[in-house]
Amino acid sequence: MSLKVGKAVPDFSLVADNGKPYKLSNKIKNKVLLVFYPGDGTPVCTNQFADFRNNEEKFKKLDVEIIGISSNDSKYHQSFKKEHNIPFTLLTDEKGQVASDYNCLGMFGIKRGIFLVDNKMQLKYSHIESVSIFRRNSDEIIDLIKKYS
């Protein structure tokens, strides 16, 4: 599936870190930054979410909710969130179907990617890292949100 800026993104329902279903179309109120990432507890992913956590207020001022998506189960997400004081919802894409729909499924699992989605489920911006050890930092993402919102 090819995602295009200005077009609708695929809706999905996944299990959240609290063990409950999370359906994008039912939860989206303002803007959402979908963050696909390889896995909880890995060095780059931990640094990425710590960076988001440390800049949480900047994202809130822009009415952006951050949602993380990896293949880890909800119990692992809970542990990761607690250990690193991560305030964002983390979703489980165990089989990689949603990652595949968003072109973030690679040979070795979920690839790192970000997708800015507005409250009408329209894609405003997307970026998939070619190598998962790279990531956009919060300042870069905040500038992109301002530019594309």
What are these regions (language model features)?
Residues M1-S149:
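Chalcogenol-based redox active-site neighborhoods
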